[in-house]
């Protein structure tokens, strides 16, 4: 499953006894082909230069750093346990669960818990480069690779040539200018909080306030808060389980309304209140309005980022999906 990696559930046969506290089931994650810009990928410093078809992660340093991140998140009950790593992937805790569906994101209780989980995630202090270079650094790298791409198939080439008629460099310049004028705190971001990266844990009551778990931290980095929330709101629109080509469906009317956004923001801020201190009603209302502007401006960056990512994936990915 997923659009970047291959996932396999592995289990011991019933007649094989487990040794010590070893798990009987694990999740095997095999990294897919994904473009890795040097020094900005996943927020991990020190990555070596990567070619257009490299597999992540690159080098021992980045493997160690990503494993550290995964282990810290597991220790804080924000992610699955890590059982082992190897250059092409890792072994993770298998958690009985199901991934959320797109329509689940609109459920007020689920949206509330996602907001709380994201706020906790943003409150973490991680041992990584805290400068917010990931967003524009990665997009610049994608643009460079896109300028060198060639597609042998006529249908892909036609779509690619149409995309090139847009001045992507100018679009990014305008986007950068807009976001530089938009205050947004730098926090440790997941950067891909879509329904497929949120588990609904089996055996938890529907009314439980701790029934969800974020997974898939490959894009996590220090980044602007507005991007993480704005990107999540964009994901309300997309269903990636569509059975027919291009294997996704976009319903723009599902983008969260003002009230749905405020519902999310208020629960996000309620979890963050311990770090911010008490606020008056007027201050709370001002913060909410500022966040609405911040989030919806950074949602534009989400569209642009994943648009560039998708062009590159159309060239290098072996997963059957309508990237272009």
Predicted regions span which residues?
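Protein kinase glycine-rich loop
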Residues: 1
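ATP-binding pocket architecture of kinase catalytic cores
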Residues: 4-167, 174-188, 207-210
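Short regulatory "switch" loops immediately downstream of catalytic or recognition motifs
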Residues: 9-16, 33-36, 147-151, 198-205, ...
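Catalytic-loop of the protein kinase fold
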Residues: 188-190, 195
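Catalytic activation segment of kinase domains across protein kinase-like and atypical kinase folds
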Residues: 199-247
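Active-site activation/catalytic loop segments of kinase-like enzymes and analogous catalytic loops
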Residues: 226-281, 300-318
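All-alpha amphipathic helical-bundle segments outside canonical DNA-binding/catalytic cores
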Residues: 281-299
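C-terminal interaction modules of eukaryotic adaptor/scaffold proteins
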Residues: 320-324
């Amino acid at each position: 499953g997923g659009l970047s990696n291959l996932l396999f559930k592995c289990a011991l046969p019933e007649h094989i006894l487990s040794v010590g506290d070893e798990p009987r089931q694990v999740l095997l994650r095999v990294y897919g082909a994904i473009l890795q810009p040097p020094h900005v990928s996943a927020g991990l410093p020190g990555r070596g230069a990567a070619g257009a078809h490299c597999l992540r992660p690159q080098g021992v340093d980045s493997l160690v750093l990503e494993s550290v991140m995964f282990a810290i998140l597991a220790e804080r009950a924000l992610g699955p346990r890590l059982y082992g790593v190897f250059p092409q992937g890792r072994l993770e805790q298998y958690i009985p669960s199901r991934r959320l569906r797109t329509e689940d994101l609109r459920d007020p209780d689920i949206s509330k818990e996602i907001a709380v989980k994201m706020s906790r995630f943003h409150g973490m202090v991680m041992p990584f480069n805290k400068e917010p270079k990931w967003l524009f650094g990665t997009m610049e790298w994608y643009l460079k690779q896109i300028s060198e791409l060639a597609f042998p198939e006529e249908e892909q080439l036609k779509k690619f040539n149409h995309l090139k008629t847009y001045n992507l460099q100018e679009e990014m310049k305008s986007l950068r200018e807009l976001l530089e004028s938009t205050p947004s705190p730098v926090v440790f971001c997941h950067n891909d909080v879509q329904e497929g990266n949120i588990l609904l844990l089996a055996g938890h009551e529907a009314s439980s306030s701790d029934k969800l778990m974020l997974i898939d931290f490959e894009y996590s980095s220090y980044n602007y808060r507005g991007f993480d929330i704005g990107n999540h709101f964009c994901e309300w629109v997309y269903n990636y389980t569509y059975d027919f080509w291009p294997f996704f469906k976009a319903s723009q009317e599902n983008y969260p309304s003002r009230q749905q956004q405020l519902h999310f923001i208020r629960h996000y801020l309620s979890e963050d209140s311990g770090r911010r201190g008490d606020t008056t009603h007027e201050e709370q209302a001002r913060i909410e309005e500022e966040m609405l502007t911040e989030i919806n401006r950074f949602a534009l960056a989400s569209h642009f980022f994943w648009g560039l990512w998708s062009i590159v994936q159309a060239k290098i990915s072996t997963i059957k999906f309508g990237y272009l």
